[in-house]
């Protein structure tokens, strides 16, 4: 018998039985299960036979991953230098340059080791957190429904599939209404397909409409998804970040190539230099100029940053989303659950009944009948929770059919049989849908809309209830005319931190737009409470309709840019809003939690799935939040900007050092025919890399405005600073070699005509200023004002202590260096400090010439973080005073032509500034109302407003 069992399971595993085609009852027979599901013991037994319901993960070869860090264009240049050191540097009576070969190899290994360790650690931490977000599913085990990880599913399990779920395994649908299934990830079909009971649904597809049970027929690698995994495999594209990395790398390589070409042309045909001396000079440019640590520093910085984001409750599914979040200047936020608590309550005292023989309690019972008693959403839980006993929702009736909520119909409905055997249908949902369903007369419709507006003015949502008799006693029959029963006021209070979080976002130059499916009046009330402003429009305005007179002349694009939010929004509207903002060169973020948000999440530059989002929303997003509310997003923006700032700081530094090494040593080699030792420039590179690795954990001040890769700024800053440092070295060499300036002024012995001691002096001077440059590029203001992180400053002083000791004491003939003593070391340190000071001024001049905004940092020291508690107080008071004067007609409102030019962040930040101004005006208006005065007194006295509102209505 056991043998037959095993044979049967083998047939199922090997697809010997076509479970997709045979009748559903035969499927249950073959799988030895019933519609009541499996027991836990049977599930465990089958799990051992079929394995977990997940795809086999590709095992990563650690050795190949390690070697992969040595396989990039910058590493190839260093590897070319290593080959040159032993293959070409072999002449002039000297052996191959083995010390340089070994040094280059050690440098490559150090970079790869650090990258491997840090990225591995960050990856493991992120994987552990992602495991907590593993797909879940509703499964029927031991006769009870429970939410379990999808990995435990086995053939024969009964699962529930509802709107927003990603189908966890291949299955056959059981009895019920058809589902709408999106199979685009598997088959490429652009439109959802209708799946009827008995048909198969595939793992990885998304439920777009309906709710139904299914029996699992295949799991893991045996599913359609598993067999066609190559169709949906992640390509791990690096996108814009990789393009930037390539552009900077190419710039550095081209700079080195030009320098080498000039050296070859001048040294050999013109100066007739010895072959080996020329090779050594070329090696100096190759070894010192190539930013070998750049891929390591940037990837490690991003990996560590991703780990930090995950600790803050934002898990990055796509690493490059970090740089996009740093540049985000518009955030389109869902209202319900993100800006509000998504914990609805009904104000029973304000319930409006439209039928004479019905009271408020009976209206609530009818609404509860049109609600789920299991697997409830927020509205269902709110309505059923208003009953004394939740069982009243089904007491005395027999449920025939339940029509679940979907974003298109915006209502639920139940068909039931009462105690007398009569059939009825009750529906609850969006008022407009129910009003249209009931075909209300004009007077009744006007009364309903007046009540809805009254609710909306108080920040309450409206829920309508309708009822009809089904005389045909058939769930598919249209029934008698619908009767409008009444309206229920629902209130979803804002999160306690939403208003402050939105103000923080606006201060950071991120314009928050509310995108809600609720009515316009509710959106405006919520926006006013949250300080977002009330410049909101209905979704019809997106089509050029129903616009205010004040904005009638504005094109739709400008309207979207100027609005604080949109109400009555459908999924296609969200997608259109994001698309239009992107076309206007905005970096757009979008939050969402439902399946209807998935298209907009995928379209947005940064799709953010909020806490408790559906599987479909998580799948479409770039960042998954593990904590509710907007505050985690603002924290993630600041962290992303800090991460991005570290990466940008390093790229400017890398370009500067390349120019500095290439130009400086090329001039020394061609003007004075000075042959610097390749080994010593290798020591400079190793010490530099050791210090620079700590930049991934450096303390930085995030940009006060959205930031992005500005290659023009990076290259311009790098070229100017690098040229200055090169000239600084050339001047130092000239003074030490051709004059007695240092001897006369500081009493040190002359090293003129002593190439080995000159090598030591140049080595120390290059080492000090090359590393000190990072303090200039890492700071937005004066470098000596912004304190670096402990590890960076410690690494700098440790590296320079080693460099100084080498310059003072080293006597290495193979490296052509002889110690110069502490006197010269002190002179070089003083020279370096004096010529370091102009670097900040050069930085400001470059930024000012490129953007005109660098002096803001010099004069105002404007940063995202500050220790001053009253930062921006004067500016806020001025804005408040201006808002008051504008409100009372004492001065005309300021206008801005911000829509004409989007080329700089000054214009982009004006959007956020205008939103702040509108929010201040809205709050000012509120304080001139009785309600506003009461709330102000309550706040000043520290009273509990919620407790007061339970007994009094303002």
From Swiss-Prot:
> Do you know which InterPro entries this protein is assigned to?
ATPase_P-typ_cation-transptr_N, ATPase_P-typ_cyto_dom_N, ATPase_P-typ_P_site, ATPase_P-typ_TM_dom_sf, ATPase_P-typ_transduc_dom_A_sf, HAD-like_sf, HAD_sf, P-type_ATPase_IIIA
Q: Which domain of life is it from?
A: Eukaryota
**Active site residues according to the UniProt entry:** 334
Instruction: Show the catalytic activity.
Output: ATP + H2O + H(+)(in) = ADP + phosphate + 2 H(+)(out)
Q: Which Pfam families match?
A: Cation_ATPase_N, E1-E2_ATPase, Hydrolase
Under the subunit heading, UniProt states: Binds to 14-3-3 proteins. The binding is induced by phosphorylation of Thr-953. Binding to 14-3-3 proteins activates the H(+)-ATPase.
Supply the name of the protein.
ATPase 9, plasma membrane-type
Species whose genome carries this gene: Arabidopsis thaliana
Species lineage: Eukaryota, Viridiplantae, Streptophyta, Embryophyta, Tracheophyta
């Amino acid at each position: 018998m056991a043998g037959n069992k095993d044979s049967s399971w083998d047939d199922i595993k090997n697809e010997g039985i076509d479970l997709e085609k045979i009748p559903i009852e035969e499927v249950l027979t073959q799988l030895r299960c019933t519609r009541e599901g499996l027991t836990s013991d049977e599930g465990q037994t089958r799990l051992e036979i079929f394995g977990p319901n997940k795809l086999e993960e590709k095992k990563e070869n650690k050795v190949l991953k390690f070697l992969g860090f040595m396989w990039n264009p910058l590493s190839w240049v260093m590897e070319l230098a290593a080959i040159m050191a032993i293959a070409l540097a072999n002449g002039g009576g000297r052996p191959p340059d083995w010390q340089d070969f070994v040094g280059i190899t050690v440098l490559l290994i150090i970079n790869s080791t650090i990258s491997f360790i840090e990225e591995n650690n960050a990856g493991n931490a992120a994987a552990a957190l992602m495991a907590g977000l593993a797909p879940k599913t509703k499964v029927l085990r031991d006769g009870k429904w429970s939410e379990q990880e999808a990995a435990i599913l086995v053939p024969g399990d009964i699962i529930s599939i509802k709107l927003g779920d990603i189908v966890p395994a291949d299955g056959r649908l059981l009895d019920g209404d058809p589902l709408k299934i999106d199979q685009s990830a598997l088959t490429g079909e652009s439109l959802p397909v209708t799946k009827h009971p008995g048909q198969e649904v595939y793992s990885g597809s998304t439920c777009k409409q309906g709710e139904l049970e299914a029996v699992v027929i295949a799991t893991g690698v045996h599913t359609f998804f598993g067999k066609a995994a190559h169709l949906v495999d992640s390509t791990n594209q690096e996108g814009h970040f990789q393009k930037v990395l390539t552009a900077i790398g190419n710039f550095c390589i081209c700079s080195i190539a030009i320098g080498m070409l000039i050296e070859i042309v001048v040294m050999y045909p013109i100066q007739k230099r010895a072959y080996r001396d020329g090779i050594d000079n070329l090696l100096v440019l190759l070894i010192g100029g190539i930013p070998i640590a750049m891929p390591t520093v940037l990837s490690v910085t991003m990996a560590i940053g991703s780990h930090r984001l995950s600790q803050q409750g934002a898990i990055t599914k796509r690493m490059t989303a970090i740089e996009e979040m740093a540049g985000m200047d518009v955030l389109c936020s869902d209202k319900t659950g993100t800006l509000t608590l998504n914990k609805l309550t009904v104000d029973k005292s304000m319930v409006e009944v439209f039928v004479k023989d019905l009271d408020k309690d009976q209206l609530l019972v009818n609404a509860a009948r049109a609600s789920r008693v299991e697997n409830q959403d927020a509205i269902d839980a709110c309505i059923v929770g208003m009953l004394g006993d939740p069982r009243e929702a089904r007491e005395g009736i027999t449920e025939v059919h339940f029509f679940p909520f979907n974003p298109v119909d915006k209502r639920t409905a139940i068909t039931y049989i009462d105690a007398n055997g009569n059939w009825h249908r009750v529906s609850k949902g969006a008022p407009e849908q129910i009003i249209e369903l009931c075909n209300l007369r004009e007077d009744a419709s006007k009364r309903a809309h007046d009540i809805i507006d009254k609710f909306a003015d108080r920040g309450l949502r409206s829920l309508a209830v309708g009822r009809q008799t089904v005389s045909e006693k058939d769930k598919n029959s249209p029934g008698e005319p619908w009767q409008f029963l009444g309206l229920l006021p629902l209130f979803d209070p804002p999160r306690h931190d939403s208003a402050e979080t939105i103000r923080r976002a606006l201060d950071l130059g991120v314009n928050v737009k509310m995108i809600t499916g609720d009515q316009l009046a509710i959106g405006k009330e919520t926006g006013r409470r949250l300080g977002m402003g009330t410049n909101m429009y209905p979704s019809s305005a997106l089509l050029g309709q129903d616009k205010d007179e004040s904005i009638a002349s504005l094109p739709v694009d400008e309207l979207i840019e100027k609005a604080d939010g949109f109400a009555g929004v459908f999924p296609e509207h969200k997608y259109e809003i994001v698309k239009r903002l992107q076309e206007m060169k905005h970096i757009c973020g979008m939050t969402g939690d439902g399946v209807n948000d998935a298209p907009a999440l995928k379209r947005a530059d940064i799709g953010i799935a909020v806490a408790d989002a559906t599987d479909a929303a998580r799948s479409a997003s770039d960042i998954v939040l593990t904590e509710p509310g907007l505050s985690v997003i603002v924290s993630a923006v600041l962290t992303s900007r800090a991460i991005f700032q570290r990466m940008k700081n390093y790229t400017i530094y890398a370009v500067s050092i390349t120019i500095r090494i290439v130009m400086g040593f090329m001039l020394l080699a061609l003007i004075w025919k000075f042959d610097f030792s390749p080994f010593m420039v290798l020591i400079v590179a190793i010490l530099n890399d050791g210090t620079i690795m700590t930049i991934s954990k450096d303390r930085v001040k995030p940009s006060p405005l959205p930031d992005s890769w500005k290659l023009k700024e990076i290259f311009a800053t790098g070229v100017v600073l690098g040229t200055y440092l090169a000239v600084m070295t050339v001047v130092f060499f000239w003074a030490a070699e051709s004059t007695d300036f240092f001897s006369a002024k500081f009493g040190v012995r002359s090293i003129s005509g002593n190439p080995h001691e000159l090598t030591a002096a140049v080595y120390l001077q290059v080492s000090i200023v090359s590393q000190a440059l990072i303090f200039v590029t890492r700071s937005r203001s004066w470098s000596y004002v912004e304190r670096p992180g402990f590890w960076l400053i410690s690494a700098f002083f440790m590296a320079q202590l080693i460099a100084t000791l080498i310059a003072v004491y080293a006597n290495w003939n193979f490296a052509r260096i002889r110690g110069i003593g502490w006197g010269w070391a002190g002179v070089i340190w003083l020279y370096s400090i004096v010529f370091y000071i102009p670097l900040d001024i050069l930085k400001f001049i470059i930024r000012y010439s490129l953007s005109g905004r660098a002096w803001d940092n010099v004069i105002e020291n404007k940063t995202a973080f500050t220790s001053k508690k009253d930062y921006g107080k004067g500016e806020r008071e001025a804005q408040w005073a201006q808002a008051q004067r504008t409100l009372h007609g004492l001065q005309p409102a300021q206008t801005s032509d911000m829509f004409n030019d989007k080329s700089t962040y000054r214009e982009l930040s004006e959007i956020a500034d205008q939103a702040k101004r509108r929010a201040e005006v809205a709050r000012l208006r509120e304080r001139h109302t009785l309600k506003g005065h009461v709330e102000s007194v309550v706040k000043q006295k520290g009273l509990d407003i919620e407790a007061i509102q339970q007994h009094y209505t303002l």
